[in-house]
Design a protein with these regions (language model features):
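Extended, low-complexity, intrinsically disordered C-terminal regulatory tails
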Residues: 46-75
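A residue-level signal for beta-strand positions that form part of recognition/binding surfaces
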Residues: 58, 87, 130
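Amphipathic alpha-helical interface surfaces
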Residues: 43-47, 70, 86, 97, ...
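Extracytoplasmic cell-surface/polysaccharide-interacting catalytic and binding patches
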Residues: 1-52, 142-150
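Short, surface-exposed glycine/acidic/tryptophan-bearing loops
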Residues: 68-88
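Catalytic cores and adjacent binding grooves of peptidoglycan-active enzymes
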Residues: 79, 84, 92-150
Length: 150
């Protein structure tokens, strides 16, 4: 697996987009294929780095790529974009920040045509917030937005 910075997304590495505490804890492999690495590069270049540049602050990724066994272990959907390296769950310090990040992606679509497949603002019952952003590698993005509480 590549470990360095992602070309065109200088604040992100392949290692951080493939990191999984669940995989580590359960001894599961979370090594991506070349296709997944290519998708992660697109994710970082089109979505994560522009978000970082716009807000000028560190963007913390809770989860991006998940190998099938890792996805199953975390209770992920069997059709999750995480399996292809086309999704990231971005940690947000507050609901306000989560909404600001979501608005950023919506504005980028409206102004620049950079579409997304899913944009889910989520909150755990314990109070943590994250924003899930995904894209379709075929460009068939549904622009699906949803708010969820776990």
């Amino acid at each position: 697996m590549k470990h360095g910075m992602i070309s065109g997304a200088t604040n992100f590495t392949y290692a951080e987009l493939c990191r999984s505490t669940t995989a580590d804890a359960k001894g599961l492999s979370n090594n991506p294929t070349d296709e997944v690495l290519s998708n992660l590069k697109t994710l970082a270049q089109r979505y994560l780095q522009p978000l970082r540049d716009h807000f000028g602050c560190q963007i913390i990724i809770n989860s991006a790529y998940r190998a099938p066994m890792v996805n199953k272990a975390v209770g992920g959907a069997p059709t999750s974009w995480h399996l292809k390296g086309c999704a990231a769950d971005i940690r947000c310090p507050s609901a306000y920040v989560a909404v600001q990040y979501a608005n950023f992606f919506i504005d980028r679509f409206e102004k620049h045509g950079v579409g997304f497949d899913e944009l889910f603002l989520s909150r755990s019952r314990k109070g943590g917030y994250w924003l899930h952003v995904s894209y379709s590698p075929t460009g068939d993005n549904r622009l699906r937005c949803q708010v969820m509480v776990y």
